[in-house]
Regions:
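N-terminal Lys/Arg-rich, disordered targeting/topogenic segments
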Residues: 1-10
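Solvent-exposed, non-transmembrane regions of membrane-associated and secreted proteins
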Residues: 10-15, 21-225
């Protein structure tokens, strides 16, 4: 009788262990989906801010070299990581607009500053670069990984001649893609500021896994409305 009780206890324990492994497995499988839903939720909140005209004015500051080094460190760190880091930081609320690239079905909020927190849910404007619609070179960066939703994952599909629209609180700026190329992370020439005209420069990692370069998409302003 005692032996039978022991066998029943062992079976019961094994059932609980099996159930525990099932729960853990479901958690691992569902985590990317839950995380992507959270990112989508944060993006929707930011886009609704734009509709409510809660848009912030921006101005240039700090050295471009320092800002680009900081951006490269963030892009490389996130690309090398295989798990989402634990953080209580929230993206800053300084929404400056949204970006649409219809050719790749992309619509994303744009936040002022390419910080780690901002780039988890949105496109970040590199501080010290131009302002959308004005004379200068506006540098916008985003991740190209599978951890934070889609973001710039399909940026390599953009072609010369494609349209990019930047909407701020008062205006919509239409840019036309003129160049798509790759550079080393240390190449600062992509941030060169023109004396005339408004340029848009999109920056992300390339390739998605173990990136060695930066994928660059540059476009020129063709219409303001």
């Amino acid at each position: 009788l005692e032996g039978r009780k022991n066998r029943l206890s062992i079976r019961s324990l094994m059932k609980w262990i099996a159930l525990l492994f099932i729960v853990i497995g479901l958690g691992v499988i569902s985590f990317p989906f839950v995380q992507n839903q959270y990112v989508a939720y944060e993006q929707d909140k930011l886009l609704h801010q734009l509709e409510a005209e809660e848009v912030e004015e921006v101005s240039g500051e700090k050295s471009l070299t320092q800002r680009y080094e900081e951006l490269n460190a963030i892009l490389d760190q996130e690309a090398a990581s295989t798990t989402s880091p634990e953080t209580k930081e929230k993206p800053s609320k300084n929404l400056i607009g949204k970006m649409e690239i219809s050719s790749i079905n992309l619509e994303l909020p744009i936040l002022n500053g390419a910080s780690m927190e901002n780039l988890k849910v949105a496109v970040g404007r590199m501080s010290g670069t131009g302002i959308p619609g004005e004379v200068g070179n506006t540098a916008l960066a985003a991740h190209r990984s599978y951890k934070y939703g889609k973001l710039f994952n399909r940026l390599d599909e953009v072609k010369i001649g494609d349209s990019i629209h930047i909407e701020t609180g008062n205006h919509t700026y239409a840019y036309q893609v003129e160049n798509v190329f790759r550079v080393l992370p240390t190449d600062l020439s992509v941030l060169k500021q023109p004396e005339t005209g408004s340029i848009l420069t999109l920056i992300t990692c390339d390739p998605i896994q173990d990136p060695t370069h930066r994928l660059i998409v540059q476009a020129s302003l063709v219409k303001t409305s």
